[in-house]
């Protein structure tokens, strides 16, 4: 009997804690097209994608009487038409606002756990003959960068779709019976115990060698490592924002767009990076939103993924670790905000605890699920804003004969009040703002504040306007 791969520890924790629905991890991406795509080509490319990346044909199956993570098992009832649906929108919903409204409702619905954890909707009859493709995928399947790698098979560089050659073979479904799942779970646990013992032995030998050669350095490193680990699992408490305290299952999607060269120029002018410039706009927007509401905001708690993905990693699964940290919001302008952010983000990216995140998540998988869910909730619901940055295609691409004019990510709130995702595409940057309406009373006002803060950041990269020469009055003799 073939054994499908198991969820990695981090993926298993994300999947398991959704016993609390506020912690759901669902990614939604909107691709706006200049015309309706060719239905046959969409089906052929999507079929090819599911064969190249088997997780798109696999369901997550638990293990009876076992603490082993869920197993990816090819769905014997895989129904392509269930996962990709075509919808003609009524005229009242044919604008971008209608697309966003449809995407919100799609995002709010949970997955059918007896099927693979992804869905797609192709919306047609939009204004000016346009169309939109909405992709919804569970975060346990892949992260943002992995998702872009998966979706590359959907895109072409010209309007005429390329011939990609023979269709790969479809994975064969070999579902295990109850006894088989019990046996596989026990075998997995036995292998894990042996692996952990080997890892512990190697670590102990290395620690002894280091302690002998550098006792002071090893003591300081151990203390720093322990402090970081404690901080990583310490409950976060209430959100730091006095305004954005509510949490719900609802979402509100909005979009901010900015030219990519302008944002890069601002990063160069401030000797920072695109990510720092992006975060400065996020912080500035939240600060102004609170100011307009007559509320003082001293700092915010941020959840930001730190990518550990390498070129050798496949597209499936997650290759990032979460960093949670507090950012002060008292800076009065964008330049000062960037200066304040540089050391904070540098420290977050170099936190020693990040290197032990896999060990921590392996520990969480063996705890009773209610305990893990409660611990995850204490970490995630105290976050004010989550922010993520994913590079998209650097040039214009086409999907089944239609040009992609906009590519916008909406990352999961997963307990936060807001998640702001950045995706670059063909010389532009799109911010997908995912607000919890229970936390953000006026999502449109927050979006305007983020847009204004982004304009302030972008202005840092533009040359100063030359002063107009003032003509002195002529002296009379």
Where do the protein language model's features map onto the residues?
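Soluble acyl-CoA-dependent acyltransferase catalytic core bearing the H(X)4D motif
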Residues: 1-11, 19-21, 26-477
């Amino acid at each position: 009997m073939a054994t499908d791969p198991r969820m990695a520890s981090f993926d298993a924790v994300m999947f398991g804690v959704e016993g609390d629905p506020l912690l759901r991890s669902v990614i939604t991406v909107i691709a706006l097209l200049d015309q309706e795509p060719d239905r046959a080509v969409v089906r052929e490319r999507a079929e090819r994608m599911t064969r190249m990346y088997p997780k798109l044909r696999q369901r997550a199956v638990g293990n009876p009487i076992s603490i082993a993570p869920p197993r990816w098992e090819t769905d014997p009832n895989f129904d392509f038409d269930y996962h990709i649906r075509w919808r003609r929108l009524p005229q009242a919903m044919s604008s971008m606002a209608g697309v966003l409204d449809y995407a919100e409702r799609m995002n709010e619905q949970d997955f059918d756990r007896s099927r693979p954890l992804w869905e797609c909707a192709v919306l047609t009859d939009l204004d000016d003959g346009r169309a939109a493709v909405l992709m919804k995928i569970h975060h346990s399947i892949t992260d943002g960068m992995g998702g872009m790698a998966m979706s590359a098979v959907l895109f072409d560089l010209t309007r005429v779709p390329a011939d990609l050659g023979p269709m790969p073979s479809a994975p064969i479904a070999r579902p295990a019976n109850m006894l088989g799942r019990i046996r596989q779970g026990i075998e997995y646990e036995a292998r894990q115990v042996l692996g952990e013992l080997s890892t512990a032995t190697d670590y102990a030998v290395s620690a002894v060698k280091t302690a002998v050669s550098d006792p002071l350095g090893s003591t300081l490193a151990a203390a720093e490592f322990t402090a970081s680990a404690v901080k990583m699992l310490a409950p976060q408490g209430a959100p730091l924002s006095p305004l954005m305290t509510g949490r719900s299952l609802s979402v509100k999607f909005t979009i901010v767009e900015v030219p990519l060269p302008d944002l890069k120029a601002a990063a160069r002018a401030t000797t920072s990076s695109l990510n720092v410039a992006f975060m400065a706009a996020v912080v500035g927007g939240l600060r102004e939103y609170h100011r307009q509401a007559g509320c003082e905001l001293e700092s915010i708690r941020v959840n930001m993924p730190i990518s550990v993905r390498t070129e050798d990693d496949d597209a499936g699964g997650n290759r990032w670790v979460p960093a949670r940290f507090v950012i002060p919001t008292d800076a009065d302008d964008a330049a000062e905000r960037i200066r304040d952010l540089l050391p904070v983000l540098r420290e977050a990216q170099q936190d020693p605890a990040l290197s032990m995140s896999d060990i921590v998540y392996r520990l969480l998988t063996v705890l009773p699920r209610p305990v893990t869910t409660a611990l995850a909730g204490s970490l995630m619901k105290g976050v004010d804003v989550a922010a993520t940055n994913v590079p998209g295609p650097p040039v214009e691409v086409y999907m089944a004969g239609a040009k992609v004019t906009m590519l916008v990510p909406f990352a999961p709130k997963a307990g936060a009040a807001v998640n702001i995702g950045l995706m670059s595409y063909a010389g532009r940057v799109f911010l997908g703002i995912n607000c919890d309406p229970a936390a953000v009373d006026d999502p449109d006002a927050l979006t305007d504040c983020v847009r204004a803060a982004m304009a302030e950041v972008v202005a840092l990269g533009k040359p100063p306007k030359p002063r107009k020469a003032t003509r002195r009055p002529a002296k009379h003799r």
